[in-house]
Structures are given as structure tokens and as C-alpha cells.
Design a protein with these regions (language model features):
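A conserved beta-strand element that flanks and buttresses the S-adenosyl-L-methionine
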Residues: 105
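Class I SAM-dependent methyltransferase SAM/SAH-binding core
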Residues: 39-84
Length: 212
């Protein structure tokens, strides 16, 4: 178990960005969805201050390990595909889950979905009016952003050696389906007010606030 007060927090670059995603969750949020929760560290972090956290993952063994790791955390663990999942306690199925969550977050999972545009549309529909969507994801390397990709690759190697990388148990998918330019195009077409920002370590942050 890693949910006890004396448990040491593992580290990798995905876990590093959990704090950034948590900072995008409104302080008064009551219901939060973590999409592609993987090993469960972000969901557990959110559960410390949010009363109703749902953690969704399509990989059953990974989800079970997360459930075991954070057995005492008040989290609803859901196995399923975000495009069709039903959410317990929301009083809604896949077709009528519009606006069910005050915040929807996702860390290093969006690139696992084949259709990025459809996935972003689905995530945005799950956000309640005035709520937030925050996604950290990867993009496909491109010549246009070659310097950023190279710098990120060097930085990743250095920080992993210094801090000691904890290997996650979730499946790896590479390369991502979209370049940064393509991802920005998807976001601009669906969520005109959203921001897409490059991060160090080769990640991208998508942040959006739903209209009231």
C-alpha cells in the first residue's frame, strides 16, 4: 500500500505533472473525473480534497493495481472506455453524462485514444458549466518543434537519472497520433477558448473552462 501517511511517493515525469493538473481543479469542486487514471496517483491526490473522485481506466489489471494500492482512498474505480463509460453515482449513463463533473483531468492518457478530436469532445461534454478540463498529453515529434522535442528528451534523461524513475505499469503507446500543430487544430475547432501550452519533458497542457 502507498496510501498511508508514511508511504513514500514514487516519482516519474507523469507523476510530476499531477500537481499541475490538481492546480487546475476548482477549489470548490465536488465531483472530479480522472480519465486514464493508470496507477492511481493523481486520483488519490485529488481525493485528499475532493469529496467525490471517479477514476476511469480501460486496462483492467492496471485499474485493479491502483485500487489495491489506494484501497483506503474514497475513490470510485471504473473500468471502461471513456467514449462509452457509465459513471456510478452520477445518475447517468454514457449518453446522458453531460455536465456530470466539476472538473475532468487526464494525465498521459489522451494519446491512447485513436480519435483525439472525438475524445476531446467527449471530455468537454462531461464538464459541468463553469467547470474545468485539464489534460497533460504527448504529441508526435515534428521538425517544426524539433528543438523543443530534443530539449525535452535531454531533460527527461537527466531528471530521471537524478531523481530515480519509477516505472509505471500502464501499457505504453508510441508514437502519439497528433503533432502539436494537429492537436492545436483539434482544440481550436472544438474549444476556441482553450489554451494549449508546451511543457518541459515533452508534454503539452490543454486547459479549458466551460461556459457558465
Amino acid at each position: 500500500m502507498l496510501d498511508g501517511p508514511s508511504a513514500k511517493q514514487p516519482w516519474n515525469i507523469n507523476i510530476h505533472y499531477d500537481a499541475l493538473l490538481e492546480s487546475r481543479v476548482p477549489l470548490d469542486a465536488r465531483r472530479v473525473l480522472d480519465v486514464g487514471c493508470g496507477d492511481g496517483f493523481l486520483a488519490a491526490r485529488l481525493a485528499r480534497r475532493v469529496s467525490d473522485v471517479t477514476a476511469l481506466d480501460s486496462d483492467a489489471p492496471v485499474l485493479q493495481r491502483a485500487r489495491n494500492r489506494f484501497a483506503t482512498a474514497p475513490i470510485k474505480w471504473v473500468h471502461g472506455d471513456v467514449m462509452s463509460a457509465e459513471f456510478p453515482g452520477a445518475g447517468c449513463g454514457a449518453s446522458d453524462a453531460v455536465g456530470a463533473f466539476d472538473a475532468v483531468v487526464s494525465n498521459a492518457a489522451l494519446h491512447h485514444v485513436g480519435d483525439t478530436r472525438a475524445a476531446l469532445q467527449r471530455l468537454a461534454r462531461l464538464v459541468a458549466p463553469g467547470g474545468t478540463l485539464a489534460v497533460v498529453t504527448f504529441v508526435k515529434p515534428s521538425f517544426r518543434n524539433g528543438l523543443w522535442h530534443l530539449t525535452s528528451w535531454v531533460a527527461c534523461g537527466a531528471v530521471n537519472r537524478i531523481k530515480g524513475k519509477w516505472e509505471h505499469t500502464a501499457p505504453v503507446k508510441w508514437p502519439p497520433p497528433d503533432t502539436l500543430r494537429q492537436l492545436r487544430g483539434h482544440v481550436r475547432g472544438l474549444l476556441p477558448d482553450a489554451r494549449v501550452r508546451r511543457l518541459l519533458f515533452g508534454r503539452v497542457l490543454i486547459s479549458w473552462r466551460a461556459p457558465d
